Every structure is written in C-alpha cells, then in structure tokens.
Amino acid sequence: DSFDQKYFAEECLSFQFTDGSKQVYCDWKKDGHGYVDFHQAIQKSVNIYFWEIALKIWRLYENDEKESLLQNYARDLGFGDYTGIDLPYERKGTVPDRELFDDWKITAPDRVREEGWLGGDLMNLIVGQGAITVTPIQVANAYANLIRGYTLSPRINIDYSASNSDLRVLRVDSEFKKMFLS
C-alpha cells in the first residue's frame, strides 16, 4: 500500500544485487541522517554509508581478487589474527570471505547458506555484523593502529612500580576528540 511505499522511500535504501534479489535496508534513525561524509558516517554510525561502499566493491569486483579489499584492510588493522597481547587464551576472531564460506559449506554447513558468499555478507562485514568475530582488544588495537599510523602489539603493564619515565603521554588531536567523543 501507499504507506509502505512512503515508508520505504523516505526511511530505507533499496539495493538491486547482481543476482537479481532485491534487499531493502533501513537506517537506525527514523528520519535519516541527510548527506554525510566518511567522518560523520563513523561518528553517527550511519550503516547505509558503509553499505554503499561494500556494495560498490561487490559490484565492481565480484569473483575478482579485489573482492577481498575490505577483508584485507580488516586484517591489516589486526582483525582475524592474534594481537600478541601478553595474556593467555587470546582468540583470533574471524574475518569472513568467499574462501571461508566455501570451506564452511563442507565443514560447517549449518553456518552458511547454500549460495555461499554474497554481496550482503560483504555489507554485513563492513558494519561489523554477520560472520565477523572480533575481540574487544582487537577493536581497541585497531583504533590505536589507525591513530598511530602503524601497528603495535598491546601490552598489559602489571608492574605498578613503573617510574614516570616509563609512561608515554598520548596526545589526541582536538578534532579527533570532537569527532569521536562528542
């Protein structure tokens, strides 16, 4: 009916996948966010912005080696691997891709659809949903790596008698504070 059409037109994005299936995605904010850039999309958690990126990657690179662009970036940030933190029982987490889904079809068929890896899985991945699994320390470390511009393994300082010379002052840009902490 017309109410449904108006609702979808004003509050949702409709994507047409290359396989012909139609998916409708709604944003969490009823009235939407208007036009946003990358920084605003992160700050306001605008999934639709990131879904658009994933969908572009899917449409351009489906079944191509570049299809794993997002996964490679996630791995560069430290997801899907051990951080090297000096604590026991650390988990690697999972960064899903076509190969993993193909493997799961055989080894864990209850974890994946018969169709395997689809564009919607990439859209889930980019917003941290679906088959991706991460640990809190991986998330914290990924943000730290982004801020630093290089990677380090996190450490737990259990020596409370450390001198002040062992402490490193972290200066955070005021624009960064404004963007992420407001």
Predicted regions located by residue number:
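Beta-lactam-recognizing serine transpeptidase/beta-lactamase-like catalytic domain environment
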Residues: 1-182
